[in-house]
Protein backbone atom coordinates (compact mmCIF):
# COMPACT_ATOMS: atom_id res chain seq x y z
CA UNK A 1 0.00 0.00 0.00
CA UNK A 2 1.27 3.44 -0.89
CA UNK A 3 1.43 5.83 2.02
CA UNK A 4 -0.57 9.02 1.68
CA UNK A 5 1.57 12.10 1.21
CA UNK A 6 -0.69 13.91 3.72
CA UNK A 7 0.23 13.98 7.39
CA UNK A 8 -1.63 11.54 9.66
CA UNK A 9 -3.38 14.41 11.51
CA UNK A 10 -4.72 15.80 8.26
CA UNK A 11 -5.87 12.38 7.12
CA UNK A 12 -7.58 11.85 10.48
CA UNK A 13 -9.23 15.30 10.17
CA UNK A 14 -10.47 14.43 6.68
CA UNK A 15 -12.00 11.23 7.95
CA UNK A 16 -13.72 13.11 10.75
CA UNK A 17 -14.95 15.76 8.30
CA UNK A 18 -16.24 13.11 5.94
CA UNK A 19 -17.96 11.36 8.82
CA UNK A 20 -19.54 14.58 10.00
CA UNK A 21 -20.60 15.50 6.47
CA UNK A 22 -21.99 12.04 5.95
CA UNK A 23 -23.84 12.27 9.23
CA UNK A 24 -25.29 15.63 8.27
CA UNK A 25 -26.39 14.26 4.93
CA UNK A 26 -28.00 11.32 6.65
CA UNK A 27 -29.70 13.68 9.11
CA UNK A 28 -30.84 15.87 6.21
CA UNK A 29 -32.28 12.87 4.42
CA UNK A 30 -33.93 11.65 7.61
CA UNK A 31 -35.26 15.15 8.32
CA UNK A 32 -36.55 15.44 4.78
CA UNK A 33 -38.27 12.09 5.03
CA UNK A 34 -39.58 13.02 8.49
CA UNK A 35 -40.99 16.32 7.24
CA UNK A 36 -42.35 14.65 4.12
CA UNK A 37 -44.13 11.91 6.05
CA UNK A 38 -45.52 14.33 8.60
CA UNK A 39 -46.49 16.72 5.83
CA UNK A 40 -48.44 14.00 4.05
CA UNK A 41 -50.15 13.03 7.30
CA UNK A 42 -50.92 16.67 8.09
CA UNK A 43 -52.31 17.13 4.58
CA UNK A 44 -54.52 14.08 5.05
CA UNK A 45 -55.85 15.40 8.35
CA UNK A 46 -56.48 18.85 6.89
CA UNK A 47 -58.37 17.34 3.94
CA UNK A 48 -60.45 15.29 6.36
CA UNK A 49 -61.04 18.45 8.35
CA UNK A 50 -62.22 20.21 5.20
CA UNK A 51 -64.83 17.52 4.60
CA UNK A 52 -65.89 17.58 8.24
CA UNK A 53 -66.19 21.37 8.13
CA UNK A 54 -68.68 20.97 5.30
CA UNK A 55 -70.68 18.61 7.51
CA UNK A 56 -70.63 21.19 10.31
CA UNK A 57 -71.99 23.80 7.93
CA UNK A 58 -74.74 21.49 6.70
CA UNK A 59 -75.81 20.67 10.27
CA UNK A 60 -75.93 24.18 11.68
CA UNK A 61 -79.70 23.87 12.05
CA UNK A 62 -79.13 20.76 14.21
CA UNK A 63 -76.74 21.78 17.04
CA UNK A 64 -76.43 18.21 18.35
CA UNK A 65 -75.30 16.87 14.97
CA UNK A 66 -73.03 19.86 14.48
CA UNK A 67 -71.47 19.16 17.90
CA UNK A 68 -70.50 15.63 16.83
CA UNK A 69 -69.02 16.94 13.60
CA UNK A 70 -67.04 19.62 15.44
CA UNK A 71 -65.58 16.96 17.76
CA UNK A 72 -64.34 15.05 14.71
CA UNK A 73 -63.07 18.28 13.21
CA UNK A 74 -61.10 19.02 16.39
CA UNK A 75 -59.43 15.60 16.21
CA UNK A 76 -58.23 16.21 12.65
CA UNK A 77 -57.05 19.78 13.16
CA UNK A 78 -55.30 18.79 16.40
CA UNK A 79 -53.44 16.00 14.60
CA UNK A 80 -52.49 18.32 11.73
CA UNK A 81 -51.18 20.88 14.21
CA UNK A 82 -49.13 18.23 16.02
CA UNK A 83 -47.64 17.05 12.73
CA UNK A 84 -46.50 20.57 11.79
CA UNK A 85 -45.17 21.91 15.08
CA UNK A 86 -42.31 19.61 16.09
CA UNK A 87 -38.70 20.95 16.30
CA UNK A 88 -37.60 19.46 12.97
CA UNK A 89 -40.49 21.13 11.14
CA UNK A 90 -39.87 24.42 12.95
CA UNK A 91 -36.18 24.33 12.00
CA UNK A 92 -37.01 23.64 8.36
CA UNK A 93 -39.23 26.72 8.23
CA UNK A 94 -36.03 28.78 8.06
CA UNK A 95 -34.84 27.14 4.83
CA UNK A 96 -35.03 29.01 1.52
CA UNK A 97 -38.00 28.31 -0.79
CA UNK A 98 -39.42 25.33 1.12
CA UNK A 99 -39.40 27.23 4.44
CA UNK A 100 -42.24 29.64 3.61
CA UNK A 101 -44.36 26.72 2.36
CA UNK A 102 -43.85 24.83 5.62
CA UNK A 103 -44.45 27.94 7.72
CA UNK A 104 -47.71 28.66 5.89
CA UNK A 105 -48.97 25.11 6.38
CA UNK A 106 -48.01 25.23 10.07
CA UNK A 107 -49.81 28.55 10.55
CA UNK A 108 -52.94 27.22 8.88
CA UNK A 109 -52.88 24.03 10.96
CA UNK A 110 -52.30 25.93 14.20
CA UNK A 111 -55.05 28.44 13.39
CA UNK A 112 -57.60 25.78 12.50
CA UNK A 113 -56.72 23.79 15.61
CA UNK A 114 -57.16 26.90 17.72
CA UNK A 115 -60.54 27.59 16.15
CA UNK A 116 -61.89 24.11 16.74
CA UNK A 117 -60.40 23.41 20.17
CA UNK A 118 -60.75 26.77 21.90
CA UNK A 119 -63.58 28.39 19.95
CA UNK A 120 -66.03 26.10 18.18
CA UNK A 121 -65.79 23.03 20.41
CA UNK A 122 -66.74 24.84 23.66
CA UNK A 123 -69.58 26.53 21.79
CA UNK A 124 -70.78 23.23 20.34
CA UNK A 125 -70.76 21.60 23.77
CA UNK A 126 -73.02 24.34 25.12
CA UNK A 127 -75.17 24.38 21.99
CA UNK A 128 -75.59 20.59 21.84
CA UNK A 129 -78.62 20.89 24.09
CA UNK A 130 -79.86 23.99 22.27
CA UNK A 131 -82.81 23.39 19.99
CA UNK A 132 -83.44 25.68 17.05
CA UNK A 133 -87.11 25.66 18.03
CA UNK A 134 -86.03 27.80 20.99
CA UNK A 135 -85.96 30.64 18.48
CA UNK A 136 -89.66 30.10 17.76
CA UNK A 137 -92.07 32.23 19.82
CA UNK A 138 -94.81 30.33 21.61
CA UNK A 139 -98.06 32.14 22.30
CA UNK A 140 -96.37 35.48 21.75
CA UNK A 141 -93.34 34.76 23.93
CA UNK A 142 -89.76 33.77 23.23
CA UNK A 143 -87.91 31.84 25.94
CA UNK A 144 -84.72 33.80 26.58
CA UNK A 145 -82.78 31.38 28.80
CA UNK A 146 -81.29 29.29 25.94
CA UNK A 147 -79.85 32.39 24.29
CA UNK A 148 -78.50 33.70 27.57
CA UNK A 149 -76.83 30.36 28.31
CA UNK A 150 -74.78 30.31 25.11
CA UNK A 151 -73.80 34.00 25.18
CA UNK A 152 -70.41 33.50 26.85
CA UNK A 153 -69.39 30.60 24.62
CA UNK A 154 -70.55 32.51 21.55
CA UNK A 155 -68.31 35.45 22.43
CA UNK A 156 -65.36 33.12 23.06
CA UNK A 157 -65.94 31.49 19.69
CA UNK A 158 -66.13 34.85 17.96
CA UNK A 159 -62.87 36.00 19.54
CA UNK A 160 -61.13 32.72 18.68
CA UNK A 161 -62.22 32.69 15.05
CA UNK A 162 -61.26 36.35 14.72
CA UNK A 163 -57.76 35.65 16.03
CA UNK A 164 -57.33 32.68 13.68
CA UNK A 165 -58.56 34.71 10.72
CA UNK A 166 -56.06 37.46 11.50
CA UNK A 167 -53.24 34.91 11.74
CA UNK A 168 -53.99 33.30 8.37
CA UNK A 169 -54.64 36.67 6.74
CA UNK A 170 -51.13 37.80 7.76
CA UNK A 171 -49.41 34.97 5.82
CA UNK A 172 -47.22 36.43 3.05
CA UNK A 173 -48.47 34.79 -0.16
CA UNK A 174 -45.71 36.12 -2.43
CA UNK A 175 -43.26 33.27 -1.67
CA UNK A 176 -45.84 30.47 -1.85
CA UNK A 177 -46.23 28.00 -4.68
CA UNK A 178 -49.64 27.93 -6.32
CA UNK A 179 -51.12 24.88 -4.51
CA UNK A 180 -50.11 26.19 -1.08
CA UNK A 181 -51.21 29.73 -1.92
CA UNK A 182 -54.61 28.52 -3.12
CA UNK A 183 -55.06 26.42 0.02
CA UNK A 184 -54.20 29.39 2.23
CA UNK A 185 -56.66 31.58 0.31
CA UNK A 186 -59.34 28.92 0.73
CA UNK A 187 -58.80 28.71 4.49
CA UNK A 188 -58.69 32.50 4.70
CA UNK A 189 -62.10 32.74 3.02
CA UNK A 190 -63.48 29.97 5.24
CA UNK A 191 -62.34 31.75 8.40
CA UNK A 192 -63.82 35.04 7.20
CA UNK A 193 -67.14 33.27 6.66
CA UNK A 194 -66.91 31.57 10.05
CA UNK A 195 -65.95 34.85 11.66
CA UNK A 196 -69.01 36.55 10.23
CA UNK A 197 -71.26 33.79 11.55
CA UNK A 198 -69.77 33.59 15.04
CA UNK A 199 -69.66 37.37 15.35
CA UNK A 200 -73.34 37.57 14.40
CA UNK A 201 -74.19 34.87 16.94
CA UNK A 202 -72.25 36.61 19.71
CA UNK A 203 -73.94 39.92 18.99
CA UNK A 204 -77.37 38.30 18.79
CA UNK A 205 -77.00 36.57 22.15
CA UNK A 206 -76.05 39.92 23.68
CA UNK A 207 -78.81 41.94 22.06
CA UNK A 208 -81.91 39.76 21.81
CA UNK A 209 -82.54 39.03 25.52
CA UNK A 210 -82.27 42.67 26.56
CA UNK A 211 -84.26 43.90 23.57
CA UNK A 212 -87.03 41.44 24.40
CA UNK A 213 -87.32 42.77 27.92
CA UNK A 214 -85.16 40.36 29.92
CA UNK A 215 -84.23 43.13 32.35
CA UNK A 216 -87.11 45.57 31.93
CA UNK A 217 -90.03 46.17 29.55
CA UNK A 218 -89.11 47.75 26.22
CA UNK A 219 -90.95 49.66 23.47
CA UNK A 220 -89.78 49.84 19.85
CA UNK A 221 -91.05 51.98 17.01
CA UNK A 222 -91.15 50.05 13.74
CA UNK A 223 -91.00 51.97 10.44
CA UNK A 224 -92.17 50.16 7.32
CA UNK A 225 -90.22 51.76 4.48
CA UNK A 226 -92.01 52.03 1.14
CA UNK A 227 -89.54 51.37 -1.71
CA UNK A 228 -92.05 52.71 -4.25
CA UNK A 229 -91.09 56.17 -2.98
CA UNK A 230 -87.32 56.17 -2.57
CA UNK A 231 -85.39 57.54 0.36
CA UNK A 232 -81.66 57.09 0.94
CA UNK A 233 -82.14 54.17 3.35
CA UNK A 234 -84.90 52.53 1.29
CA UNK A 235 -88.20 54.39 1.18
CA UNK A 236 -90.50 56.74 3.01
CA UNK A 237 -91.78 55.47 6.35
CA UNK A 238 -95.42 54.75 5.52
CA UNK A 239 -97.00 52.38 7.98
CA UNK A 240 -95.73 52.39 11.57
CA UNK A 241 -96.13 50.17 14.61
CA UNK A 242 -95.22 50.10 18.28
CA UNK A 243 -93.89 46.78 19.59
CA UNK A 244 -93.87 46.13 23.35
CA UNK A 245 -91.63 43.46 24.91
CA UNK A 246 -91.47 42.18 28.47
CA UNK A 247 -89.61 39.08 29.66
CA UNK A 248 -89.63 37.63 26.15
CA UNK A 249 -93.32 38.39 25.56
CA UNK A 250 -93.93 40.36 22.37
CA UNK A 251 -97.08 42.34 21.60
CA UNK A 252 -98.27 44.74 18.93
CA UNK A 253 -99.18 47.78 21.02
CA UNK A 254 -100.21 50.30 18.34
CA UNK A 255 -100.33 50.93 14.59
CA UNK A 256 -100.25 54.25 12.77
CA UNK A 257 -99.59 55.87 9.42
CA UNK A 258 -97.04 58.55 8.66
CA UNK A 259 -99.95 60.56 7.28
CA UNK A 260 -101.08 60.98 10.91
CA UNK A 261 -98.04 63.18 11.56
CA UNK A 262 -97.88 66.92 10.93
CA UNK A 263 -95.27 68.97 9.15
CA UNK A 264 -93.22 70.53 11.92
CA UNK A 265 -92.32 74.20 11.65
CA UNK A 266 -88.70 73.49 12.55
CA UNK A 267 -86.52 70.39 12.70
CA UNK A 268 -87.48 68.41 15.80
CA UNK A 269 -83.78 67.86 16.60
CA UNK A 270 -80.65 69.76 15.53
CA UNK A 271 -79.38 68.34 12.24
CA UNK A 272 -76.03 70.10 12.15
CA UNK A 273 -74.71 72.49 9.53
CA UNK A 274 -73.32 69.79 7.22
CA UNK A 275 -76.56 67.81 7.01
CA UNK A 276 -78.67 70.95 6.64
CA UNK A 277 -76.44 72.24 3.83
CA UNK A 278 -77.05 69.05 1.85
CA UNK A 279 -80.59 68.01 2.79
CA UNK A 280 -82.12 71.17 4.22
CA UNK A 281 -84.40 70.74 7.25
CA UNK A 282 -86.74 68.29 5.51
CA UNK A 283 -85.50 65.19 7.40
CA UNK A 284 -86.33 66.88 10.69
CA UNK A 285 -89.72 68.31 9.72
CA UNK A 286 -91.52 65.41 7.99
CA UNK A 287 -91.54 61.87 9.31
CA UNK A 288 -91.66 60.71 5.69
CA UNK A 289 -88.17 62.19 5.26
CA UNK A 290 -86.33 60.89 8.33
CA UNK A 291 -84.64 58.18 6.23
CA UNK A 292 -83.42 60.73 3.68
CA UNK A 293 -80.16 61.08 5.64
CA UNK A 294 -78.21 57.83 5.03
CA UNK A 295 -77.40 57.36 8.70
CA UNK A 296 -80.01 55.41 10.63
CA UNK A 297 -78.79 56.74 13.97
CA UNK A 298 -79.98 60.14 12.76
CA UNK A 299 -83.18 58.69 11.28
CA UNK A 300 -83.99 56.75 14.44
CA UNK A 301 -83.48 59.71 16.74
CA UNK A 302 -85.70 61.92 14.56
CA UNK A 303 -88.48 59.32 14.37
CA UNK A 304 -88.31 58.74 18.12
CA UNK A 305 -88.69 62.45 18.82
CA UNK A 306 -91.62 62.78 16.43
CA UNK A 307 -93.31 59.79 18.06
CA UNK A 308 -92.81 61.36 21.49
CA UNK A 309 -94.38 64.62 20.34
CA UNK A 310 -97.43 62.76 19.07
CA UNK A 311 -97.79 60.54 22.17
CA UNK A 312 -97.45 62.73 25.20
CA UNK A 313 -93.69 62.44 25.49
CA UNK A 314 -93.51 58.61 25.36
CA UNK A 315 -89.89 57.63 24.76
CA UNK A 316 -89.28 54.40 22.86
CA UNK A 317 -86.17 52.30 23.48
CA UNK A 318 -85.25 52.03 19.85
CA UNK A 319 -86.35 52.24 16.24
CA UNK A 320 -86.50 49.40 13.70
CA UNK A 321 -86.97 49.77 9.94
CA UNK A 322 -87.77 47.16 7.32
CA UNK A 323 -89.30 47.13 3.85
CA UNK A 324 -91.74 44.93 1.88
CA UNK A 325 -88.86 43.06 0.23
CA UNK A 326 -87.65 42.04 3.71
CA UNK A 327 -91.25 41.11 4.48
CA UNK A 328 -91.27 38.80 1.46
CA UNK A 329 -88.22 37.04 2.91
CA UNK A 330 -90.05 36.58 6.22
CA UNK A 331 -92.97 35.05 4.34
CA UNK A 332 -90.60 32.31 3.17
CA UNK A 333 -90.31 31.37 6.85
CA UNK A 334 -94.00 31.69 7.74
CA UNK A 335 -95.53 30.46 4.53
CA UNK A 336 -98.35 32.32 2.73
CA UNK A 337 -100.75 34.31 4.91
CA UNK A 338 -104.43 34.80 4.10
CA UNK A 339 -105.55 38.33 4.94
CA UNK A 340 -109.05 39.25 6.16
CA UNK A 341 -109.72 40.66 2.66
CA UNK A 342 -109.14 37.21 1.16
CA UNK A 343 -105.82 38.22 -0.39
CA UNK A 344 -103.02 35.72 0.04
CA UNK A 345 -99.75 37.39 0.99
CA UNK A 346 -96.87 35.25 -0.29
CA UNK A 347 -93.16 35.69 -1.03
CA UNK A 348 -93.77 36.05 -4.76
CA UNK A 349 -96.56 38.65 -4.60
CA UNK A 350 -95.95 40.71 -1.45
CA UNK A 351 -93.95 43.45 -3.16
CA UNK A 352 -96.38 43.81 -6.07
CA UNK A 353 -99.43 43.79 -3.79
CA UNK A 354 -98.11 46.18 -1.14
CA UNK A 355 -96.24 48.64 -3.34
CA UNK A 356 -98.41 48.86 -6.45
CA UNK A 357 -101.69 46.95 -6.57
CA UNK A 358 -103.01 48.49 -3.36
CA UNK A 359 -102.93 51.97 -4.91
CA UNK A 360 -105.02 50.84 -7.86
CA UNK A 361 -107.52 49.06 -5.61
CA UNK A 362 -107.95 51.77 -2.98
CA UNK A 363 -108.06 55.41 -4.01
CA UNK A 364 -108.44 56.84 -0.50
CA UNK A 365 -105.17 57.04 1.50
CA UNK A 366 -107.05 56.01 4.65
CA UNK A 367 -108.10 52.75 2.98
CA UNK A 368 -104.54 52.13 1.81
CA UNK A 369 -103.29 52.70 5.36
CA UNK A 370 -105.88 50.27 6.72
CA UNK A 371 -104.73 47.61 4.26
CA UNK A 372 -101.08 48.07 5.24
CA UNK A 373 -101.97 47.87 8.93
CA UNK A 374 -103.97 44.69 8.35
CA UNK A 375 -101.11 43.07 6.43
CA UNK A 376 -98.54 44.02 9.08
CA UNK A 377 -100.75 42.75 11.90
CA UNK A 378 -101.35 39.44 10.10
CA UNK A 379 -97.63 38.83 9.61
CA UNK A 380 -96.88 39.81 13.21
CA UNK A 381 -99.57 37.44 14.50
CA UNK A 382 -98.09 34.54 12.56
CA UNK A 383 -94.54 35.28 13.68
CA UNK A 384 -95.37 35.84 17.34
CA UNK A 385 -97.64 32.81 17.40
CA UNK A 386 -94.74 30.53 16.47
CA UNK A 387 -96.10 29.56 13.04
CA UNK A 388 -92.66 29.85 11.50
CA UNK A 389 -89.68 27.75 10.47
CA UNK A 390 -86.98 29.08 12.85
CA UNK A 391 -84.04 28.20 10.60
CA UNK A 392 -85.75 29.89 7.65
CA UNK A 393 -86.53 32.87 9.87
CA UNK A 394 -82.86 33.29 10.77
CA UNK A 395 -82.00 33.05 7.07
CA UNK A 396 -84.63 35.64 6.16
CA UNK A 397 -83.43 38.10 8.79
CA UNK A 398 -79.81 37.54 7.78
CA UNK A 399 -80.56 38.21 4.12
CA UNK A 400 -82.58 41.32 4.96
CA UNK A 401 -79.71 42.59 7.10
CA UNK A 402 -77.11 41.86 4.44
CA UNK A 403 -79.16 43.86 1.92
CA UNK A 404 -79.60 46.82 4.32
CA UNK A 405 -83.36 46.21 4.44
CA UNK A 406 -83.42 45.64 8.19
CA UNK A 407 -82.11 48.49 10.34
CA UNK A 408 -81.95 48.97 14.09
CA UNK A 409 -81.08 51.87 16.36
CA UNK A 410 -81.06 51.59 20.14
CA UNK A 411 -81.14 54.34 22.74
CA UNK A 412 -79.15 52.07 25.07
CA UNK A 413 -75.46 52.87 24.54
CA UNK A 414 -74.18 49.37 25.27
CA UNK A 415 -76.54 47.91 22.67
CA UNK A 416 -75.79 50.59 20.10
CA UNK A 417 -72.08 49.88 20.50
CA UNK A 418 -72.75 46.22 19.63
CA UNK A 419 -74.69 47.33 16.55
CA UNK A 420 -72.35 50.13 15.52
CA UNK A 421 -70.18 48.38 12.92
CA UNK A 422 -72.84 46.05 11.50
CA UNK A 423 -75.13 46.45 8.49
CA UNK A 424 -78.06 46.68 10.93
CA UNK A 425 -76.77 50.06 12.11
CA UNK A 426 -77.34 51.63 8.69
CA UNK A 427 -74.42 54.04 9.07
CA UNK A 428 -72.55 56.10 6.50
CA UNK A 429 -70.19 54.08 4.29
CA UNK A 430 -66.94 53.44 6.15
CA UNK A 431 -63.59 52.72 4.50
CA UNK A 432 -61.14 50.33 6.15
CA UNK A 433 -58.24 48.02 5.31
CA UNK A 434 -60.58 45.80 3.28
CA UNK A 435 -62.23 48.38 1.01
CA UNK A 436 -62.71 52.05 0.20
CA UNK A 437 -66.48 52.56 0.12
CA UNK A 438 -68.63 54.93 -1.90
CA UNK A 439 -72.28 55.65 -1.10
CA UNK A 440 -75.04 55.87 -3.71
CA UNK A 441 -78.36 57.08 -2.33
CA UNK A 442 -81.49 57.88 -4.33
CA UNK A 443 -84.60 59.78 -3.25
CA UNK A 444 -87.98 60.48 -4.81
CA UNK A 445 -88.74 64.10 -5.61
CA UNK A 446 -92.09 63.51 -7.28
CA UNK A 447 -94.18 62.90 -4.18
CA UNK A 448 -95.41 59.69 -5.77
CA UNK A 449 -95.11 55.92 -5.87
CA UNK A 450 -93.45 55.96 -9.30
CA UNK A 451 -90.20 54.45 -8.03
CA UNK A 452 -91.93 51.09 -8.34
CA UNK A 453 -91.06 51.52 -12.04
CA UNK A 454 -87.56 52.90 -11.54
CA UNK A 455 -84.17 51.25 -11.36
CA UNK A 456 -80.75 52.45 -10.29
CA UNK A 457 -77.63 50.75 -11.68
CA UNK A 458 -74.21 51.40 -10.17
CA UNK A 459 -70.72 50.46 -11.36
CA UNK A 460 -67.19 51.13 -10.11
CA UNK A 461 -63.75 50.86 -11.69
CA UNK A 462 -60.20 52.02 -11.24
CA UNK A 463 -59.47 54.07 -14.38
CA UNK A 464 -55.83 54.13 -13.29
CA UNK A 465 -54.15 52.89 -10.15
CA UNK A 466 -50.86 51.75 -8.67
CA UNK A 467 -50.24 49.22 -5.93
CA UNK A 468 -47.49 49.66 -3.36
CA UNK A 469 -45.56 46.97 -1.50
CA UNK A 470 -48.20 46.90 1.23
CA UNK A 471 -50.94 46.12 -1.29
CA UNK A 472 -52.65 49.50 -0.94
CA UNK A 473 -53.51 51.65 -3.93
CA UNK A 474 -53.47 55.20 -5.24
CA UNK A 475 -55.17 56.40 -8.39
CA UNK A 476 -58.43 57.48 -10.00
CA UNK A 477 -61.75 55.70 -9.44
CA UNK A 478 -64.82 56.11 -11.63
CA UNK A 479 -68.33 55.79 -10.18
CA UNK A 480 -71.20 55.50 -12.65
CA UNK A 481 -74.87 55.67 -11.63
CA UNK A 482 -77.70 55.27 -14.14
CA UNK A 483 -81.32 55.97 -13.23
CA UNK A 484 -83.97 54.53 -15.55
CA UNK A 485 -87.74 55.00 -15.73
CA UNK A 486 -89.40 51.78 -16.92
CA UNK A 487 -92.98 53.02 -16.47
CA UNK A 488 -95.40 52.32 -19.33
CA UNK A 489 -95.76 54.97 -22.03
CA UNK A 490 -99.21 55.88 -20.69
CA UNK A 491 -97.92 56.32 -17.13
CA UNK A 492 -99.77 59.63 -16.86
CA UNK A 493 -103.01 57.63 -16.72
CA UNK A 494 -101.96 55.62 -13.66
CA UNK A 495 -103.84 56.28 -10.40
CA UNK A 496 -103.17 59.74 -8.98
CA UNK A 497 -101.60 58.35 -5.81
CA UNK A 498 -99.01 56.54 -7.95
CA UNK A 499 -98.16 59.47 -10.26
CA UNK A 500 -98.24 62.08 -7.50
CA UNK A 501 -100.88 64.08 -9.36
CA UNK A 502 -98.39 66.92 -9.94
CA UNK A 503 -98.53 67.80 -6.24
CA UNK A 504 -94.86 68.88 -6.26
CA UNK A 505 -94.85 70.39 -9.73
CA UNK A 506 -93.79 67.22 -11.55
CA UNK A 507 -96.13 66.28 -14.43
CA UNK A 508 -97.95 62.96 -14.08
CA UNK A 509 -95.93 60.07 -15.51
CA UNK A 510 -92.60 61.84 -15.01
CA UNK A 511 -90.24 60.76 -12.23
CA UNK A 512 -87.99 63.15 -10.36
CA UNK A 513 -85.01 61.63 -8.57
CA UNK A 514 -82.52 63.30 -6.25
CA UNK A 515 -79.25 61.45 -5.84
CA UNK A 516 -76.55 61.81 -3.20
CA UNK A 517 -73.16 60.29 -4.05
CA UNK A 518 -70.69 59.92 -1.18
CA UNK A 519 -66.96 59.66 -1.85
CA UNK A 520 -64.81 57.59 0.52
CA UNK A 521 -62.84 59.43 3.17
CA UNK A 522 -59.61 60.77 1.69
CA UNK A 523 -60.84 60.86 -1.93
CA UNK A 524 -61.04 64.15 -3.82
CA UNK A 525 -63.43 64.91 -6.67
CA UNK A 526 -61.67 65.22 -10.04
CA UNK A 527 -64.60 65.36 -12.46
CA UNK A 528 -68.39 65.01 -12.53
CA UNK A 529 -70.72 64.86 -15.53
CA UNK A 530 -74.40 64.20 -16.17
CA UNK A 531 -75.41 62.62 -19.46
CA UNK A 532 -78.27 65.13 -19.76
CA UNK A 533 -75.94 68.09 -19.26
CA UNK A 534 -77.35 69.17 -15.90
CA UNK A 535 -75.15 70.15 -12.97
CA UNK A 536 -74.42 69.08 -9.43
CA UNK A 537 -74.75 70.32 -5.88
CA UNK A 538 -73.41 68.82 -2.69
CA UNK A 539 -71.30 69.44 0.34
CA UNK A 540 -69.36 67.55 3.00
CA UNK A 541 -70.76 65.06 5.50
CA UNK A 542 -68.62 63.69 8.32
CA UNK A 543 -65.37 63.85 6.35
CA UNK A 544 -66.87 62.65 3.07
CA UNK A 545 -67.36 64.71 -0.08
CA UNK A 546 -70.99 64.53 -1.22
CA UNK A 547 -72.16 65.22 -4.78
CA UNK A 548 -75.89 65.64 -5.41
CA UNK A 549 -78.00 65.78 -8.57
CA UNK A 550 -81.66 66.01 -9.59
CA UNK A 551 -83.17 64.56 -12.76
CA UNK A 552 -86.62 64.30 -14.35
CA UNK A 553 -87.30 61.26 -16.51
CA UNK A 554 -90.17 60.42 -18.86
CA UNK A 555 -91.28 56.79 -19.31
CA UNK A 556 -88.44 54.90 -20.99
CA UNK A 557 -85.92 57.61 -20.17
CA UNK A 558 -82.59 57.29 -18.37
CA UNK A 559 -79.75 59.52 -17.21
CA UNK A 560 -76.23 58.67 -16.07
CA UNK A 561 -74.07 60.43 -13.51
CA UNK A 562 -70.32 59.80 -13.77
CA UNK A 563 -67.82 60.83 -11.10
CA UNK A 564 -64.05 60.53 -11.10
CA UNK A 565 -62.48 60.60 -7.65
CA UNK A 566 -58.78 60.47 -6.79
CA UNK A 567 -57.01 58.74 -3.94
CA UNK A 568 -53.69 60.56 -3.64
CA UNK A 569 -52.81 58.74 -0.42
CA UNK A 570 -52.80 54.92 -0.19
CA UNK A 571 -56.19 53.28 0.34
CA UNK A 572 -57.50 49.72 0.16
CA UNK A 573 -57.09 48.25 -3.32
CA UNK A 574 -60.75 47.22 -3.37
CA UNK A 575 -63.52 49.71 -4.11
CA UNK A 576 -67.09 49.04 -3.02
CA UNK A 577 -70.38 50.93 -3.16
CA UNK A 578 -73.17 50.96 -0.59
CA UNK A 579 -76.48 51.63 -2.35
CA UNK A 580 -80.09 52.38 -1.51
CA UNK A 581 -82.04 49.10 -1.23
CA UNK A 582 -84.67 49.18 -3.97
CA UNK A 583 -87.19 46.60 -5.17
CA UNK A 584 -84.60 44.34 -6.77
CA UNK A 585 -81.89 42.39 -4.91
CA UNK A 586 -78.67 44.41 -4.99
CA UNK A 587 -75.81 43.41 -7.25
CA UNK A 588 -72.34 43.49 -5.73
CA UNK A 589 -70.58 46.70 -6.77
CA UNK A 590 -66.81 46.41 -6.45
CA UNK A 591 -63.53 46.89 -8.28
CA UNK A 592 -59.99 45.78 -7.43
CA UNK A 593 -56.81 47.55 -8.46
CA UNK A 594 -54.85 45.12 -10.59
CA UNK A 595 -57.72 42.62 -10.65
CA UNK A 596 -61.28 42.16 -11.76
Predicted feature residues:
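Terminal targeting segments of Actinobacterial cell-envelope proteins
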Residues: 1-16
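Hydrophobic membrane-insertion alpha-helices, especially the h-region
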Residues: 18-34
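Non-catalytic, solvent-exposed segments at the cell envelope interface
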Residues: 34-587, 593-596
